[in-house]
Amino acid sequence: MRIEKDKELMNILKIMAPGTPLREGLENILRAKTGGLLILGDSDQILKLVDGGFKINSEYSPSYVYELAKMDGSIVLSSDLKKILCANAQLIPDSSIPTFETGTRHRTADRVAKQTGAIVIAISQRRNIITVYKGGIKYVLRDSSIILARANQALQTLEKYVAVLDRVVNNLNILEFKDIATLFDVVTAIQRSEMVMRIVSEIERYICELGNEGRLIDMQLSELIKSVEEDGILLIRDYCRSNMEYEDIYKQIQGLSSEELLNLDGLSKIIGYTGVPLVDTLISPRGYRMINKIPRIPSNVIENLVANFNQLKCVMEASYEQLDNVEGIGEARAKAIKNGLRRLREQIMLDKV
């Protein structure tokens, strides 16, 4: 459900993550300090820009790429990265394409990437860095140790944010069962959920860039977040105005800047509450989030429950017969819902103590 703002970048990072044959070849060139220019793609549009060089048409190998980079020209690889098509070639892109790069190699790489939409990699001889271009994207690959340090720092930050979110959500749980939740409590929980998910997105990019070396970070991340995003979406479904689409609201919240996310009044407007006091406005949940915590209750049954009772308190107050009348709920499931909500309430109240 997250908006993939940098989906293209993530795909690029996966191709050249540490441990991949392509990254091994790039690292070899970097260590040799020869510099290099590689283009990934074999479409007619790309091959039209290639002038001269040697037709290699050989299987890809990190050591082959390293040896071929000793020559001045560009190396053209097939789009599936299985073949080296040609080496020592000159790339001649449209010179009218604007670029803010300075070195000849990087200017060419930027223009070819913009003109063809292909991945072009420039390895600087003097600065000893690898720069990746694709369309309008430019990304400098960093050393694994730097990324690992940043990922660990982000995990520590995430841990603190998750602890705050848990406190906010636990408080909201208590208020929901007492039916005294305010708009302030709800938008605070939505805000905290989105803050956590933004850090998660950042860590996921680090994991992608680390490749094989990111497995431990990935395991720690999975342990920390569990069902944070799902709960955040259900929270929106519980409290947004009935005439609004929860998916559109979630996308809108994701599109907010960091400053806008801090504005609780702005968040309340997004879920449909305009010009009302946050602290004094009591709102009741529909029950999506709480009922979802009961084991073995299908989503279509939850939909039917909410459609019939409209509020969590009405579901809790309903008799077995009233629950049994809802489509998809028999006697056994009615008992499971009643007992499940009772156990949830007891557990939440015990956690408070």
Curated annotation (Swiss-Prot):
EC class name: transferase
Top-level division of the source organism's lineage: Bacteria
EC code(s) of this entry: 2.7.7.85
InterPro entries, A to Z: DisA (IPR050338), DisA_sf (IPR038331), DNA_integrity_DisA_N_sf (IPR036888), DNA_integrity_scan_DisA_link (IPR018906), DNA_integrity_scan_DisA_N (IPR003390), DNA_integrity_scanning_protein (IPR023763), RuvA_2-like (IPR010994)
CC cofactor: Mg(2+)
Gene Ontology biological process: DNA repair
Domain DAC residue range list: 6-144
Tagged with keyword Transcription: no
Subunit structure: Homooctamer.
Function, in words: Participates in a DNA-damage check-point that is active prior to asymmetric division when DNA is damaged. DisA forms globular foci that rapidly scan along the chromosomes during sporulation, searching for lesions. When a lesion is present, DisA pauses at the lesion site. This triggers a cellular response that culminates in a temporary block in sporulation initiation. Also has diadenylate cyclase activity, catalyzing the condensation of 2 ATP molecules into cyclic di-AMP (c-di-AMP). c-di-AMP acts as a signaling molecule that couples DNA integrity with progression of sporulation. The rise in c-di-AMP level generated by DisA while scanning the chromosome, operates as a positive signal that advances sporulation; upon encountering a lesion, the DisA focus arrests at the damaged site and halts c-di-AMP synthesis.
Descriptive protein name: DNA integrity scanning protein DisA
Native source organism of the sequence: Clostridium botulinum (strain Hall / ATCC 3502 / NCTC 13319 / Type A)
